[in-house]
Amino acid sequence: MIKERSQKAIEILTKNDRGGYTVPTSKLYPHQWNWDSAFSALGISTYNKIRAWQELIILIRAQWKNGMIPHIIFHENNPNYFPGPNHWQIKSNANTSCHSQPPVLASIIWDMVNNGNNYDLQKGKSLFNSLMAYHEWFFSARDPNNKGFISIIHPWESGRDNCPDWDLGLHNVNAVSYTHLTLPTICSV
């Protein structure tokens, strides 16, 4: 049973591979996501180390100058996905969102290095400064009172964005001024 599930996981990761990065699902989420890429790399590392590190390197290439690694990297502009790269209106080295996600990336890399060989150690070392910048960004941008508590500023940053945890707080948002969108991406799922 475990072997069958492992094979199924490999099939899904392979199907969602876009040549250097993985999408969570091909229709609903057609871009690279921070958390998803980290966890995908961990899975991919069990059968293809080179491809696993490529996933993380491509993710980190989208890192902002201030250290943030965005939660979405738009390698392509899919007109059926909202909010797409034009929505964010940012000036960065890549088309990205303006949110991040909690930094599980360091834990994933730690695991890949600890369970790997010298190749993994060298790759981990090559990403160390980027990881430090990412964590420093969290402590400077998301802990403004220096209390040691990192906060998030939007449900999408939690990695639990479609969870009922947010219903109470979002219930207070006046949605009258917002436009209802029916997106082809959502309708096709």
Q: Positions of the model-derived regions?
A:
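Low-complexity, Ser/Thr/Pro/Gly-enriched N-terminal "stalk/linker" regions
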Residues: M1-Q32, W53-Q54, I58, G67-I72
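Active-site-adjacent bridging/hinge elements
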Residues: I10-G19, N78-G84, L181
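Core domains of carbohydrate- and sulfate-ester-processing enzymes
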Residues: R160-Y178
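Helix-terminus loop motifs that line ligand-binding clefts
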Residues: K49-M132, F139-E157
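Short N-terminal secondary-structure initiator segments
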Residues: I10-D36, S40, Q122-A141, N145, ...
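Conserved small/polar residues in nucleotide/adenosyl-binding loops
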Residues: T179-T185
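Solvent-exposed loop and edge beta-strand segments that line ligand/cofactor-binding
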Residues: G20-A38, L42-Y47, F82-P102
